[in-house]
Design a protein with these regions (language model features):
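A short, flexible loop at the N-terminus of ABC-type nucleotide-binding domains that lies
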Residues: 1-33
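ABC-family P-loop ATPase nucleotide-binding domains
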Residues: 10, 69-162
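ABC ATPase nucleotide-binding domain signature region
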Residues: 30-92
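Conserved catalytic/dimer-interface elements of ABC ATPase nucleotide-binding domains
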Residues: 55, 190-191
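Conserved catalytic loops of ABC-family nucleotide-binding domains
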Residues: 163-178
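Conserved H-loop
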Residues: 179-186
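A cytosolic small-molecule/anion-sensing beta-strand core signal
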Residues: 194
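Conserved beta-strand-loop-alpha-helix hinge in the C-terminal portion
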Residues: 197-224
Length: 234
């Protein structure tokens, strides 16, 4: 089970709280595909980091199990190590055979000889391909996605999408995005993050309408003065 129970997360911006979540709740069951729409810069990455256990909430409970993995997550990759060394470390981290996992990642990423070079020599697109190869090679119970489900050129993106679709036949997805089209195609449950609250919607169309009307023109709006008292600004 994944999600949030009365979770609050904020950070200070120019002395005022920039709210990501404020007493927000959401429960996601096994194998569910949930899309949450949120404007750019309003906390997509923070929400994913909280679900992944990388960043704690200021208050409340984060629900998570041990079988989740952030899609395209590059935080575990070290720039001084080669692509091969990096994915072997990831394999050991999640309990997979390093040799088999490295072979899979080398084939999927299509990096050629660069696979055996240090990551600091990679371009952004090369790092993205390696990160997605590593993510899709892990048989996660739930994938956590921050605004994208694929990387690279059109052919490689299609390859990512096909492989992810295969994985999602027996796995869940929590997809936090700013593009309603992406969540429509990938998710079955839909919601919107509004002023720190997670609002569940009955359909993608309802979520898109709420997102478009209430957020695209009001991204970055500060919370009401009466709510400031609930945050410790010391």
């Amino acid at each position: 089970m994944w999600g949030f129970v009365d979770c609050t997360r904020y950070y200070l911006s120019l002395g005022l709280p920039k709210v990501v979540l404020h007493d927000a709740s959401l429960v996601v069951g096994a194998h569910e595909k949930v899309g949450l729409l949120i404007p750019p810069g309003e906390g997509k990455s923070t929400i994913i980091r909280m679900l992944a256990g990388v960043e704690p909430p200021d208050s409340g409970i984060v629900l998570r199990d041990d079988g989740g993995w952030p899609l395209g997550y590059a935080g575990a990759l070290q720039p001084t190590l080669t692509g091969d060394e990096n994915v072997r470390n990831v394999a050991l981290m999640v309990g997979l055979d390093p040799d088999e996992f490295s072979m899979w990642c080398a084939d999927f990423s299509e990096l050629g000889e660069a696979y055996f070079e240090p990551l600091r020599l990679y371009s952004g697109s090369m790092r993205g391909r390696l990160a997605f190869a590593a993510s899709l090679g892990i048989p996660a119970s739930t994938y956590l996605a921050d605004d994208r489900l694929a990387v690279g050129d059109e052919r490689f993106r299609q390859k990512c999408e096909v492989t992810l679709a295969e994985r999602l036949q027996s796995a869940g997805l929590i997809f936090v995005a700013s593009n309603p089209r992406l969540t429509k195609e990938a998710c079955e449950r839909h919601g919107v993050v509004s002023r720190g609250k997670i609002i569940e919607c009955g359909s993608h169309e309802e979520a898109e309408e709420l997102f478009t009307q209430n957020f695209r023109d009001n991204a970055g709006e500060e919370i009401a003065d009466e709510e400031l008292a609930s945050f410790d600004l010391a």
